[in-house]
A protein has these predicted regions:
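Regulatory N- and C-terminal appendages and interdomain linkers associated
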Residues: 9-43, 106-108, 120-170, 442, ...
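C-terminal motif of bacterial Sec signal peptides marking the signal peptidase cleavage site
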Residues: 4-7
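Middle-to-C-terminal accessory/interaction subdomains
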Residues: 179, 183-184, 303-366, 370-373, ...
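Conserved oxyanion/phosphate-binding beta-strand-loop segments in alpha/beta enzyme cores
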Residues: 153-211
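Short, well-structured beta-strand/strand-turn elements
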Residues: 83-87, 231-243
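Beta-rich interaction/scaffold domains
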Residues: 9-129, 133
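Internal "kinase-insert"/substrate-recognition segments embedded within catalytic cores
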Residues: 189-197, 204, 211-213, 232-237, ...
Length: 504
């Protein structure tokens, strides 16, 4: 405050009287965060570039770190209106105090008697699309039979959040898989209420999330699918790597994949066609979809369409495969008109055989996940490809080295090798795949480079590189070692097979 002096006219000789006038108190501004940034200069072990947070609304700040670190101990730099700042109630000297951002933290700005809170989220951005799934009530997914309702969001480019890059919808989700369902990192099946396009692929209601838990490279299925894409097989499932955030927690890197089913953009065999799976029947499953034939050890499952035991569709399918199986093992199976090629498509069987033999797919001896399709009026065709996470020598309970035949001993395939025409076709097609070795290696290298940040974040979540994971034969200790081992195995496999096929 200050004093002013009031005076009267000099004529009345009155003394001057001081008057107290209060100072004007400036209004305290509302505390406000202007910007929050992690500078690479302040965080050289974690960042290669500066990362600025996105202020959402008036209380949330979201970061996407462009590369992955083993921790999120970071020094922030802030521009703000206020006198002081705290992070999780710890006073912070912005630009010098390191804080742990592994979990959401509360940043509080104080100015006078006013405070303002911001919740800070630091996500590790790996370059992959990010998928959020929130089940109702955040209930755990515990069943492979019963779907749960959930909200769904898929952001293709989390850096720009461009309008066309975000898909939001409701979805139903359940568990899936056989041995993979028993793993710590679970695989899932997704079913939308209406057909949707995910990451540019043709619209459909049904999709799956493959966990790749047993495959530390996360490349085996993708590489086998690449072989399918360059083959004579009519359809190979399209897939993309994504990061899954399930019920608010990062759950690892998954392979979003088209579910195998009949459809115009999937297994295109028309309304009267069939999709079969030669597989070991799960104990307790209904008989309604299954039948057996004489020369296959496991049952044939009618995956699509829906059938009832003994109905017209079921009987047609059973008769079709039974007759084909019988003719394949008959005395006149080489007959050019009435022999096995009347019922089996030689091109698809040759390519399916070779892809599974080249990759040494443990499950493909007509025992597990062996798919076959039929279009009315046509022949039985092999495909689509499926289930390669323990292929490429990635098993400890079966032959795993790059030498030795494996799939050739599958019942139907072994019989087909008794036909010189099939042998000639296999040799011709093997030479084609052999000529594509450089393309295959480039594909592996490109995908490994694409996943270089994702695999570290996935490792931080699941800790598999230095531990035994069923049914791995080796523990290589790093992602680069895992990929290098796979490539060396595949090169050796190609060379061994070439030598053997050249002898035929």
């Amino acid at each position: 405050m200050f004093f002013a002096t009031l005076s009267c006219s000099k004529d009345n000789d009155e003394p001057e009287i001081p008057v107290e006038i209060p100072e004007e108190v400036p209004e305290v501004e509302d505390p406000q965060l202007k910007s929050l940034t992690f500078l690479s200069y302040d965080n050289p072990m974690q960042l290669t570039t500066d990362v600025k947070g996105e202020i959402i609304g008036d209380s949330i700040v979201e970061f996407w770190i462009p590369n992955i670190t083993s921790d999120k101990l970071l020094i922030p730099k802030a521009e703000y209106v206020g006198e002081s700042i705290k992070i999780d109630d710890v006073p912070s000297t912005i630009g010098s105090t390191k804080h742990d951002f592994k979990k959401p933290v509360i940043l509080t700005i104080a100015n006078g008697d006013k405070t303002k809170d911001y919740t800070i989220y630091v996500h590790s951005f790996t370059g992959l699309p990010v998928m959020w799934i929130e089940t109702e009530g955040r209930k755990d997914i515990t069943s492979k039979e019963v779907y749960q309702r959930a909200s769904f969001k898929l952001v293709e480019d989390v850096r720009t959040r461009a309008a066309g890059d975000i898909i939001e919808d409701s979805v139903s989700i359940k568990g899936r898989g056989n041995s993979t369902w028993g793993m710590a990192k679970k695989p899932y099946a997704l079913k939308f209420d209406k057909k949707v396009s995910l990451l540019g692929e043709p619209k459909d209601k049904s999709w799956v999330l493959l966990n790749n838990y047993a495959d530390k490279t996360m490349l085996r299925i993708k590489t086998a699918f690449f072989l399918g894409e360059i083959s004579n097989l009519e359809y190979t499932a399209r897939s993309h790597f994504v990061e899954l955030i399930l019920n608010g927690r990062y759950n690892g890197t998954y392979q979003l994949c088209e579910k195998l089913k009949i459809g115009k953009d999937r297994v295109n065999v028309g309304d009267d066609g069939y999709l079969f799976e030669i597989d070991a029947r799960v104990t307790g499953e209904s008989d309604s979809r299954y039948f057996t034939v004489n020369h296959l050890a496991n049952s044939v499952d009618i995956k699509d369409p829906d059938v009832e035991y003994g109905d017209e569709k079921y009987n047609f399918a059973k008769e079709l495969v039974t007759v084909a199986d019988s003719v394949l093992y008959s005395a006149n199976f080489l007959d050019p008109n009435e022999g096995w090629q009347k019922y089996f498509d030689i091109d698809s069987f040759a390519d399916w055989y070779l892809i599974n033999e080249i990759t040494h797919n443990t499950d493909s001896r007509m025992s597990l996940s062996c798919y076959m399709n039929y279009k009315k009026g046509g022949k039985l065709k092999m495909g689509p490809l499926w289930d390669f996470d323990i292929a490429f020598g990635n098993t400890d309970y079966a032959q795993r080295g790059p030498e030795g035949f494996w799939v050739i001993y599958a019942n139907w395939i072994y019989r087909m090798f008794a036909d010189p025409a099939f042998v000639a076709k296999v040799k011709e097609r093997f030479n084609y795949f052999y000529s594509k070795r450089d393309d295959i290696m480039r594909e592996i290298n490109a995908n490994a480079n694409y996943l270089k940040y994702a695999v570290q974040e996935n490792e931080n979540r699941w800790h598999t590189f230095y531990t035994y994971t069923w049914p791995n034969y080796d523990i290589w200790g790093s992602y680069n070692n895992e990929v290098q081992s796979m490539k060396e195995w595949l090169n050796a496999r190609f060379e061994w097979l070439k030598g053997e096929f050249d002898k035929m």
